[in-house]
Structure formats: C-alpha cells, structure tokens
C-alpha cells in the first residue's frame, strides 16, 4: 500500500495521506509546481491527453482563491527500475491545441524514485499551465497549417488580480 498517496489541496497547501497508514505531510502549491518542474512528478502514458479548456482552468483557480476543495490526487511511487521499464510523460507547460496535448516523453535520470500521477493530472496540468505556462487554441475561421502557427493559435496567459475586488463587469478571474 505504500505505492499510493492521496493528496488534498487547500488554498496554499497540499495534504498527503499514505494509504493505509495515516502519514500526513503538508506542502504548498508552489512545492507541487516545483516537483512538476523538476520532473519528480510525471505522467504514465496510460493517462488521457490534456482536455481542459480555459474556462475550466479559470474555475480551478477561482476555487483555490475562494478556498474551496478541489478534490484529491492519487500518486504512484515508482522506483527508477520500474520507471525505466515503462513510458512516462512530463506535464505540459505550454498547451497548444492539436500540436501539444500531451507532455514531452520522460526518460528517468538519477532519482531513486519518481511519483506518477494516477488521478488528478488535469488539475495539476492546469495549475502548471496557469502558474508558468500558456494556452493556445485555434482562432475561428482560420485554416490549420502543417505546423504550429501563433497567428492561428495565439498564446494566452492567466493573470490573477489580487489587488482589487472584481467589479460587476468582471465575470471571470
């Protein structure tokens, strides 16, 4: 049972529960992003591609800002030997509809263990894109080309205004 970790987010922290033992550890969201950036947290290839749209990303950040629960994640502790026998991906930093809907292939390095996200990859990818990445979707009525073209798929970024209250004209984050 030491292979499974259930994670619960609060506004700025993550709680880890080792199953079945009640070993609890609290981490800040920033630490989770750092684990994703360092590729200590990876995605197994059996995970579906990233499918969340911009509204879902905004809703996730809205829930965090309001201190609403955003459910839990399940993490699989993978040894370097096991990681070498399976295929994994990194999380997506810059999402591009059609061209980049899964992360880059991951090759194990020197770590003794990696942590593969079994449940929660859409939310973690959204956090990573929201904090450090971009999101590009095709503009209407433009034709696809053979390669990524930013004029057809302009990058968008998430900005959080923490200095002012939302006014009546602001419907999204």
Please describe what each predicted stretch is.
Residues 1, 9, 16-17:
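Aromatic (phenylalanine/tyrosine) cluster motif
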Residues 16-54, 58-173:
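Basic- and aromatic-enriched surface patches that contact anionic nucleotides/nucleic acids
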């Amino acid at each position: 049972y030491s292979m499974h970790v259930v994670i619960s987010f609060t506004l700025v922290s993550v709680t880890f529960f080792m199953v079945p033992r009640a070993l609890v550890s609290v981490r800040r969201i920033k630490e989770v992003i750092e684990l994703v950036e360092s590729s200590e947290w990876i995605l197994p290839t059996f995970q579906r591609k990233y499918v969340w749209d911009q509204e879902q990303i905004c809703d996730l950040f809205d829930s965090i800002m309001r201190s609403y629960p955003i459910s839990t994640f399940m993490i699989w502790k993978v040894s370097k030997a096991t990681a070498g026998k399976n295929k994994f991906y990194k999380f997506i930093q810059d999402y591009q509809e059609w061209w980049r809907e899964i992360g880059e292939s991951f090759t194990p390095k020197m770590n003794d263990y990696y942590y593969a996200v079994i449940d929660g990859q859409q939310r973690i990818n959204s956090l990573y894109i929201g904090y450090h990445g971009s999101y590009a979707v095709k503009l209407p009525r433009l034709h696809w080309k053979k390669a990524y073209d930013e004029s057809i798929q302009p990058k968008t970024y998430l900005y959080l205004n923490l200095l002012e209250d939302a006014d009546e004209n602001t419907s999204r984050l």
